[in-house]
Structures are given as C-alpha cells and as structure tokens.
C-alpha cells in the first residue's frame, strides 16, 4: 500500500478541541468486520460487546507535564522546551525539542520559572530541533522532578489551538495511568470512566495492563510513498508476566482480546512468541504496523479517529480492512464524529 491511499479531506471543525463532558459519553462507532456493518452508539455501550472472561489490554503509561517555557540568557527570548525523555537521571540530562530552534546553540543557557529557579545548559544538537539539555539544579532528584512538574504544562497536541486549562491535566490522562513516561496520552483509554470500569469488572471482564511510553513519534507524519521505507521512533515498552498470563489464558479459552488503542496493539504485537502467545518484554520497540499485517493476539480493538496519512490510520487499515475503514471514515465525517486525541471512538470487532 502507498501513502496516498491514506489521504482524505478532514474538515477542521471535526478536530476535537475539548473532550466530551463525561468520559464515557463520547460517541462510539462500532465496525463489524465479518458483517461489514457500521453502528452508532455511545461509548458506555461498549459494555454490551464483551462477556465474562473477555480481556481488555490497557496501556497504563502516564503523561508527564512535558512542555516547558523558558527564556534564553542575555536576549530573554521565549523558548518552548518539550521534554522527550530522560537520558541520565544522575546528570539530569534530557533529550528535548526546542522551538524556535534557530538560535539555540551548544553552550546556551535557558532559564525557567518566574524566579529563574531552574536553569538548563545546551550540551548537544541531536536534530534540527532536537537538543540535549543538562539541568542545573541544587536540590535532590525528587525535588528536581517536582520542579519540572510544577513548571511543566500538560502536553496537549499542537493541533489544539486553545490555551491549556487545568482540566487538561486530568482529562489528557487515562484514569488507570500509573507509570510515568509518556509525552502523549494513549487516547482510546480516555473514554473509560471509573463507573464504566466498575461495570466491566462486575460483568467479569478482565484487564491486562502493559506499559508503552508514547513518544512524539506518534504524531510524526509519514513522508515516504512506499510505507515499508518509513522508520518509527523507538518507544519504551514493558510487558509483565502477569499481563501475559491474562492474555494467553483468554486466547486459550477463545475469549475476546481487545486492544484498547493503537499503543496497546503495538505493545502486544511487539512481543509475540513463535506459538503466537504473548511474551514478557522490557526494552524498546519501533514496530510499524501497516497493511498487510497478520495480527496474532487481539480479536478486536478500540481506537479514536485519526488524521490523514498517520501511522495510526495505517494500523487501523491493517486491522479493519482498508475498504471498510475508508467507508467507516467517510461515515464518521458525514455524521460529524470528532477526530483525534479528544475525539470520539471506534470499536472494531
């Protein structure tokens, strides 16, 4: 398949600027692959599609406030610093993106906070916008991390043109987020409320938690027409033995296994044994799933509506079937479903 197969016109007004008032009251499109049908529901109706013993695979990564605003020494120019990942805790080295990047050179110092209580020095250029920063801070490591949290902003995606609000800190986070390390939320999980999780539990549905720390690569546009030439950024992945046991037992008894989000799907597809069972994993993955792809574990998935030419859309095409996905997306646009991080959801069965 080619990149051009994933182009479609998405009206700007369908990009969700805000989340639904209640998590589980966003809209849900249910796409049935066997029947080729499309239904329109509310997200809380997802309960009707699962039975006792079915498993939902959840990504329990937690978004940290990765967007900082600082000032450059001497000129005082305002610089956005986006924390990508910690390289060395002891030396307080971080891989970051800076904007505007043009004048941020090795040796420059950046000051953060009204009282300049946090200082960082640029020690390397990694890409055109990428830099390595060393933070200069006298307190303990815990105090340093608290300072980053205090100064940082929730990293809502750039397509959202409004200012960040205090509500974003809560709503751009799943209710089951535990392991801090993501710079973007695994957005399919945002639709689950505490009440819905409880109802699923009462019905006998099980949860298998995996951790994939979502990086900014999730938003990277694909720039090659031949998809096999696209390279994904690596993301940190951890799958415990406990999660494997839950998923493999469900597979054995032929229960439904549902990947909640593209990140959960990438996680489990990155660690499949030759017997097509789930293996524990602790490392990095750069797996890129695009058509054709033979999925080993999940029998259904929940996902949001994605932007044109995104790697996320390519995975959906591989799982759903390209023609049915195109039909579903055309229907979503016609019915004015909301797209992207704060948008509506799709259940593919």
Curated annotation (Swiss-Prot):
InterPro entries reported for this sequence: QueA, QueA_dom1, QueA_dom2, QueA_sf
Protein's GO biological process: queuosine biosynthetic process; tRNA wobble guanine modification
Pfam families: Queuosine_synth (PF02547)
Catalytic reactions of this protein: 7-aminomethyl-7-carbaguanosine(34) in tRNA + S-adenosyl-L-methionine = epoxyqueuosine(34) in tRNA + adenine + L-methionine + 2 H(+)
Gene Ontology CC terms, in alphabetical order: cytoplasm
EC number: 2.4.99.17
An annotated Gene Ontology molecular function: S-adenosylmethionine:tRNA ribosyltransferase-isomerase activity
Biological pathway: tRNA modification; tRNA-queuosine biosynthesis
Keyword Transferase: yes
Keyword S-adenosyl-L-methionine assigned: yes
Transmembrane parts of this sequence: none
PANTHER family, A to Z: S-ADENOSYLMETHIONINE:TRNA RIBOSYLTRANSFERASE-ISOMERASE
Family assignment from sequence similarity: Belongs to the QueA family.
HAMAP family: QueA (MF_00113)
Stated name of the protein: S-adenosylmethionine:tRNA ribosyltransferase-isomerase
Species of origin: Flavobacterium psychrophilum (strain ATCC 49511 / DSM 21280 / CIP 103535 / JIP02/86)
Biological classification of the source: Bacteria, Pseudomonadati, Bacteroidota, Flavobacteriia, Flavobacteriales
